[in-house]
């Protein structure tokens, strides 16, 4: 009775230039959710300001460099706004690190030059007008080069649309308001702020799903290329 032995075939091909991305993706996902939680918290404070109503002494910023003393609710809003800023910085650091990795991996997998030069991973977020499409473009290009022929997930476009909407209608691309000005807006017209916060929370959640989808597609492609084939003999 003969025994059947498993004999390894030729070694699987190696893909040079790949960078580990799973841990970066997990950290980025949690950072996105943390940033979303920060916007939920700030929305709660904006509702509290709106329901409390503006004090008889007027808004905190009274013009011509004059600022009245803040009450306790306004002081706490400053703290919440600071915490939101911290979560956004943390999220930006992890997100850009993840973008670099998926972009580099897409080059390693496709052996093609990326559509956008490396400096756009940073500058694409801060240059006016360019920041309306380049970050999404970098991710979309990395996805298409990683898994050619596969349709771009709808969550990529949904995430980006929500991000741009939230920034444009709230405190980002159009408005450059201080915390005192935001307090004044919460007193006099809170709804645009709440729409912005809701969009940013939705962008954080869809961003979390987007990072998972892009990373999963890339890691599946890597696994299919580097799997060790075996033959029975």
What is the role of each PLM region?
Residues 67-88:
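Interfacial helix-start motif at the membrane-water boundary
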Residues 2-73, 94-123, 130-164, 169, ...:
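Membrane-interface extramembranous regions at the lipid-water interface
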Residues 81, 85, 105-106, 190:
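Generic signal for short, ordered secondary-structure residues
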Residues 188-198:
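Membrane-interface transmembrane-helix boundary segments in multi-pass integral membrane proteins
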Residues 84-91, 196, 200:
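Alpha-helical transmembrane segments of integral membrane proteins
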């Amino acid at each position: 009775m003969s025994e059947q032995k498993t004999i390894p075939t030729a070694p699987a091909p190696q893909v040079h230039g790949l960078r580990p991305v799973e841990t970066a993706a997990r950290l980025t996902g949690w950072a996105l959710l943390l940033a979303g939680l920060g916007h939920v918290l700030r929305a709660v404070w904006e509702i509290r300001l709106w329901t409390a109503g503006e004090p008889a002494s007027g808004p905190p910023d009274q013009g011509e460099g004059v600022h009245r003393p803040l009450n306790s609710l306004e002081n706490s809003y400053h703290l919440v706004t600071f915490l939101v800023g911290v979560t956004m910085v943390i999220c930006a650091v992890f997100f850009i690190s993840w973008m670099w990795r998926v972009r580099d991996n897409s080059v390693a997998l496709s052996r093609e030059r990326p559509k956008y030069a490396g400096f756009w991973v940073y500058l694409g977020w801060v240059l006016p007008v360019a920041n309306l499409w380049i970050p999404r473009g970098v991710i979309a290009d990395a996805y298409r080069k990683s898994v050619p022929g596969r349709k771009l997930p709808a969550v990529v476009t949904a995430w980006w649309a929500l991000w741009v909407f939230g920034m444009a209608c709230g405190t980002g691309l159009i408005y450059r308001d201080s915390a005192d000005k935001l307090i004044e807006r919460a007193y006099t017209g809170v709804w645009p702020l709440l729409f912005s916060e809701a969009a940013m929370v939705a962008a954080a959640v869809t961003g979390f799903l987007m990072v998972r989808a892009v990373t999963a597609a890339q890691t599946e492609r890597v696994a299919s290329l580097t799997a060790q084939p075996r033959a029975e003999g």
